[in-house]
Amino acid sequence: MAEAENIAIVRRTYDEVFNRGNLDLVDAIFAPNFKNHTAPPGMQDGPGGVKALVTMLFAAFPDDRHDIEDIFASGDRVAARVRHHGTHARPFMGLPASGRHVSQEQMHIVRLEGGRWAEHWGVRDDLSFRQQMASPEQGG
C-alpha cells in the first residue's frame, strides 16, 4: 500500500474511532491479531482491546479528542504526533473525576498490513496526564 494511503487509514482511525467513538469500524480497521505493544495494563490485544480502550476513554472523558499535529509514513509504518485531551468527568485509572480539562502529548507508530492496523507502539506523557487529573491532596 502507498504511504499516502497508510496515512489516510491512520487519520480515519483517529477521526472516526478515537474521536467519535465509532466502534463499528474497529473490526474493519484493526487486524484480528492486532498487537498493541503499549496497551494499558490488563488490556487485551486484537480489536476487542481497542474497543475496550475507546469505551474506557469516552467513559472518563465524554469530549475525548486525539488531534494529529504531525504525521508521516515510511513503507508500512506511520508515525503520528498526537495531542490527546478532554474533560476528566468520570473516574479514570483509579483517579476520581476532577472536572478538569487535561491534555497529553503522544507519539504513535503504527504498522499496517493489508490496509489494517497490525501493530502499535506509543509513547505518552502519562505522569503529566495523571498530575493534571489529581487533586492537590493526590499530588496534582
Regions found by a protein language model. Give the residues of each.
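C-terminal and inter-domain tail/linker signature
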Residues: 1-140
